[in-house]
């Protein structure tokens, strides 16, 4: 798939931008603070319903002085189908639109797939479990049609159980039973889909991370589902009810799951350098994109923010060459044109003080 048009209004320092995109590599060049990362952020918003940057709250996303923001994308799929997606915000909630009609956020993000490597991506490896669950569930969402409904049912039951746990008055035990049964049923389904996804992801991880970090040896994926193996979640929740009452929240379930990567020559995360964490995270994102392509028949849009600052020249060249070779649409930012792109065909946009100039086309 590729974004053919990206229209942005009121996002950070971008007052108004209407960007036409084509195939292949697109580079947004400008000084720090010019607004080039916000272009990638807009594409990511359409795919994830949130920002990849810290400070992604609505009031921070808004351009200073603006009361609303909107992002519109026109997406061409491999089969020629064109989807038009939009997200707007004026108040507390996102307003989502798909092909001109009101839609759920889930419908919009299912239409647009974007993966992004950026300065904070190392948190996928070095950060908390929530970041890794987000990565995992985004991938599962795009390949398992049942996932979104199961996830919504699970979240509703979790919210209801937590509400009972925080009640100021005593709660009859039988009031917990229906919500715990729902958590167990939907949690088992989510767990099964996650495990199946990780099994499918592993060969792609071996290829991408093995190419980026061959010195670390063989890769192993570890997954903990969030409650003890061989036990029914409903039984665990019943057993843990008193403990959860004292804490005011549900401490077991798929919302507590964790997965990690270990290496033959770096069995613990602490054995990785900061640079190796970044390359491992990059490998995870490229593997996820490759799995998406193998199952959907088209590559997601790949964003590489501040490429030259995040990767050395050899890894820049390898990644850009790989993505160009498979025909992915790639959006790159930098304070100048990254060296590996100078020998490739690319659309180069100059970004200055929140304005995006029409592209110059560099041909190899």
Where are these regions (language model features)?
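Conserved NTPase motor "head" modules and their coupling/switch loops across ABC/AAA+ ATPases, GTPases
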Residues: 1-31, 171-185, 189-301, 310-329, ...
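Conserved lysine of the Walker
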Residues: 36
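Post-Walker A helix-loop "phosphate-sensing" segment adjacent to the P-loop in P-loop NTPases
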Residues: 45-57, 287-295
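Nucleotide-state sensing region of NTPase/ATPase domains
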Residues: 48-131, 135-147, 199-207, 238-242
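Structural recognition of the conserved hydrophobic beta-strand(s) that form the central parallel beta-sheet
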Residues: 73, 329-335
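Long, charged N-terminal accessory/stalk domains
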Residues: 123-124, 130-177, 181
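Walker B catalytic acidic pair
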Residues: 305-307
């Amino acid at each position: 798939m590729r974004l053919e048009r990206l229209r942005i209004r009121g996002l950070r320092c971008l007052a108004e931008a209407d960007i036409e995109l084509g195939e292949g590599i697109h580079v947004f060049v400008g000084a720090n603070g010019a607004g080039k990362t916000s272009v990638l952020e807009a594409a990511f918003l359409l795919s994830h319903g949130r920002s990849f940057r810290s400070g992604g709250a609505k009031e921070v996303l808004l351009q200073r002085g603006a009361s609303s923001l909107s992002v519109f994308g026109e997406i061409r799929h491999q089969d020629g189908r064109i989807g038009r997606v939009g997200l707007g915000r004026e108040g507390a909630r996102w307003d989502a639109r798909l092909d001109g009609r009101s839609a759920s956020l889930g419908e919009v993000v299912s239409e647009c797939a974007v993966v992004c490597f950026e300065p904070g991506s190392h948190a996928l490896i070095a950060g908390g479990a929530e970041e890794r669950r987000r990565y995992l569930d985004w991938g599962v969402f795009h390949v398992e049609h049942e996932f979104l409904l199961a996830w919504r049912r699970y979240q509703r039951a979790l919210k209801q159980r937590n509400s009972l746990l925080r009640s100021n008055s005593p709660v009859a035990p039988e009031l917990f039973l229906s919500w715990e049964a729902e958590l167990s049923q939907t949690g088992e389904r989510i767990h099964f889909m996650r495990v199946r996804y990780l099994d499918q992801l592993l060969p792609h991880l071996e290829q991408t991370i093995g190419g980026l970090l061959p010195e670390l040896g063989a890769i192993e994926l570890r997954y903990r589902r969030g409650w003890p193996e061989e036990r029914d979640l409903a039984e665990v929740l019943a057993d843990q009810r008193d403990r959860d009452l004292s804490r005011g929240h549900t401490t077991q379930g798929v919302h507590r799951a964790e997965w990690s990567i270990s290496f033959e020559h770096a069995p613990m995360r602490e054995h990785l350098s900061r640079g190796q964490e970044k390359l491992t995270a990059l490998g995870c994102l490229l593997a996820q994109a490759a799995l998406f392509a193998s199952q959907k028949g088209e590559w997601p849009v790949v964003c590489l923010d501040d490429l030259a600052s995040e990767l050395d020249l050899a890894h820049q060249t390898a990644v850009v060459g790989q993505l160009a070779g498979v025909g992915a649409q790639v959006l790159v930012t930098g304070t100048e044109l990254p060296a590996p792109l100078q020998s490739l065909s690319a659309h180069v946009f100059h970004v200055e003080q929140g304005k995006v100039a029409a592209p110059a086309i560099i041909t190899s």
